[in-house]
C-alpha cells in the first residue's frame, strides 16, 4: 500500500521528497557512475541531462493525460525546451528517472523538429503511463515503475550495425546485464539482456501473440537470435572484466545491475538498478544475493557537487591507505 501510494496519490512537498529517495532513479546512481568511468577507457555513457521536475508540473502526471488542455501541454513543451536546451536538429532518447517506455520505442525516441518541440508531452505521457501501472484497476498491478521526480533527456546513439528493429523501431543490439556487489567489489552474475527464452515466450506465447506487432517481433528475434548470442558469448568475459576493474572506484553501496549496450565495437553503460528490483536476477547464485535496504525518510540531500566532493574525499582515503600498506610492506621486508 505504501509503495502504491507513492505512485498514485496527489503530491505534496513531503511526498515529493519521499519519491526523490528512490535509489533506482538515475540522479542517484549516475554521478557515482560518472566518477567510476573516468578510471577506464572501455565504456562510454550517453550524454545525459537530468532535471528535478517542479512539483506543480509533476502533479500533472497524476491527472488523466487525455484531459490535459492544449495550453497545458504547450506550457510543458516550452518548459522542457528551455530546461533541456533542446536542439530541433538533434535526436533524443527520453525517460523518467526510472522508466523509458522503450517497449513502444516511438514513445522514447524523439526526432524531427516537430517531435522535439513536443518533447515535454512525450515525457509527461510516459510518466503518466508508468504511474497507471500502479492503479488498483491495473491487472497485474505493478508499483515502482516510475517512482521518481526526475525527467531525463539523453543523446540518441545511432545504430552502427544496421540491426533489425523490434518494439516498433528499437534497434536490436546485443546487451549485457551485469550484477555486481559494490560492498565486496565483485561481479556476481552476468546474463544476456535479451534472454532468448523470455523473448520468444513474450512474442509468441502470450495473449497478444497474434497481433501484427508481436508476430513481426517474434520473426525478427528468431532470425537474429544466433547473431545476438554469438556476440554475447564472444564479449561477455571482456565486459565482465572491465566492469570488475571499475568497481574499486564505484562508491555506491549494495548490489546492483548494470546494463551494457554494444553498438559495433562500442560499449555503453545505459542503465542501473538495485539487483533485487532487476529482472534476470536469478542468474545470481542465491548464496550471494542480499536484500536491499530501503529508506524512504527524506533528509537533507547532497547536490551533485557535494556528491563528487564526498566521493573524491573517499578516493583520496583509499589511495592514502594503499600508500600506507606499501610503506608498511617495505618496512616489514627490511626488518626480515
Labelled PLM ranges:
Residues 1-174, 179-197, 203-241:
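Active-site nucleotide/adenylate-binding loops and adjacent lid/helix of ATP-dependent enzymes
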Residues 179, 261-262:
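Conserved protein-kinase catalytic-loop segment immediately C-terminal to the catalytic Asp
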Residues 195-200, 276-280:
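A short local loop/turn or secondary-structure capping micro-motif enriched for an aromatic residue
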Residues 230-241, 249-254, 262-336:
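C-terminal active-site "lid" helix and adjoining low-complexity regulatory extension at the edge
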Amino acid at each position: 500500500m505504501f509503495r502504491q501510494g507513492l505512485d498514485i496519490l496527489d503530491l505534496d512537498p513531503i511526498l515529493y521528497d519521499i519519491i526523490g529517495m528512490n535509489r533506482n532513479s538515475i540522479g542517484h546512481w549516475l554521478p557515482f557512475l560518472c566518477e567510476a568511468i573516468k578510471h577506464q577507457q572501455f565504456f562510454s555513457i550517453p550524454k545525459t541531462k537530468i532535471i528535478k521536475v517542479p512539483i506543480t508540473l509533476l502533479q500533472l502526471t497524476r491527472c488523466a493525460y487525455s484531459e490535459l488542455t492544449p495550453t497545458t501541454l504547450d506550457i510543458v513543451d516550452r518548459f522542457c525546451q528551455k530546461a533541456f536546451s533542446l536542439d530541433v536538429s538533434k535526436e533524443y532518447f527520453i525517460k523518467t528517472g526510472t522508466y523509458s517506455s522503450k517497449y513502444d520505442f516511438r514513445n522514447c525516441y524523439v526526432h524531427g523538429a516537430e517531435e522535439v518541440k513536443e518533447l515535454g508531452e512525450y515525457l509527461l505521457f510516459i510518466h503518466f503511463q508508468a504511474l497507471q501501472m500502479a492503479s488498483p484497476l491495473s491487472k497485474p498491478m505493478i508499483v515502482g515503475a516510475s517512482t521518481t521526480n526526475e525527467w531525463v533527456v539523453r543523446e540518441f546513439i545511432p545504430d552502427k550495425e544496421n540491426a533489425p528493429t523490434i518494439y516498433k523501431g528499437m534497434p536490436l543490439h546485443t546487451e549485457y546485464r551485469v550484477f555486481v556487489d559494490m560492498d565486496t567489489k565483485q561481479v556476481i552474475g552476468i546474463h544476456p539482456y535479451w534472454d532468448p527464452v523470455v523473448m520468444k515466450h513474450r512474442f509468441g506465447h502470450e495473449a497478444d501473440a497474434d497481433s501484427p506487432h508481436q508476430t513481426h517481433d517474434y520473426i525478427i528475434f528468431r532470425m537474429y537470435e544466433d547473431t545476438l548470442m554469438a556476440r554475447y558469448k564472444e564479449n561477455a568475459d571482456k565486459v565482465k572484466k572491465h566492469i570488475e576493474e571499475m568497481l574499486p572506484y564505484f562508491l555506491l553501496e549494495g548490489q546492483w545491475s548494470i546494463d551494457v549496450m554494444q553498438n559495433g565495437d562500442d560499449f555503453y553503460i545505459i542503465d542501473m538498478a538495485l539487483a533485487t528490483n532487476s529482472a534476470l536476477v536469478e542468474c545470481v547464485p542465491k548464496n550471494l544475493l542480499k536484500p536491499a535496504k530501503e529508506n524512504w525518510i527524506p533528509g537533507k540531500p547532497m547536490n551533485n557537487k557535494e556528491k563528487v566532493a564526498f566521493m573524491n574525499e573517499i578516493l583520496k582515503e583509499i589511495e592514502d591507505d594503499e600508500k600506507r600498506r606499501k610503506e608498511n610492506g617495505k618496512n616489514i621486508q627490511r626488518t626480515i
